[in-house]
Amino acid sequence: MSFVESGRRSAPLRRRPGTPVPFARPAYSVFSQGDSWGEGEVEEEEGCDQVARDLRAEFSAGSSSKLRKDPVLQPDGDGSPVLPDKRNGIFSADAGGKALARRWPVQVLSILCSLLFAILLACLLAITYLIVKELHAENLKNEDDVNTGLLGFWSLLIISLTAGFSCCSFSWTVTYFDSFEPGMFPPTPLSPARFKKMTGHSFHMGYSMAILNGIVAALTVAWCLM
């Protein structure tokens, strides 16, 4: 062992306890190239650096394209554009209050339209009830004291079918708009291809109840007019 080697080995021992030891990056020799472990580490570090650079480039390109696509709002009094107050995908309380303030007229209008529709439906049902009551009261008695209605068979059948079809159509429309997939067209209760795949059964109970409502309405009107 030479004095130079002993001096190199004893140099770290002569450092003070509080002095940080500089760590040099290991340099790989020519013999570590090829299929060795050193080349894998170098290639992995270079690959990570390349991935980081690609991610930075994508983020910068995405942010710049978003700024170009987003419309700039009207400038404020000082000339600076007003941007939406949104941080981390969440609007602030002021922005939420403004959205609610803009939305309440639409909600009030929808409530008024619903009330108007309910009033019109009630008026239509009241008029229908009065007509049915008058037709049921105007019966004639023949010589054998048997009540004979003014309506014939075909008139009674047409009125009953019209009432049943109207009730069935209304229930069908309500079920269609209230279903979990209102975009499915046509709204049929029998759709084994798609409905069975989604729910496990091929018959929609809501549509069957709509058909049952129409049948019951037709029978009720026919019984009242007889």
From Swiss-Prot:
InterPro entries: ARL6IP6. Keywords: Membrane, Nucleus, Phosphoprotein, Transmembrane, Transmembrane helix. It holds the Pfam family ARL6IP6. Residues 1-26, 62-81 are annotated as: Disordered. The modification Phosphoserine is found at S2, S36, S60, S65, S80. The chain crosses the membrane at residues 111-131, 150-170, 205-225. One of its GO terms (cellular component) is nuclear inner membrane. It is a multi-pass membrane protein. Its main location: nucleus. The keyword Phosphoprotein applies. It is found in: Nucleus inner membrane. Signal peptide: none annotated. Belongs to the ARL6IP6 family. This is ADP-ribosylation factor-like protein 6-interacting protein 6.
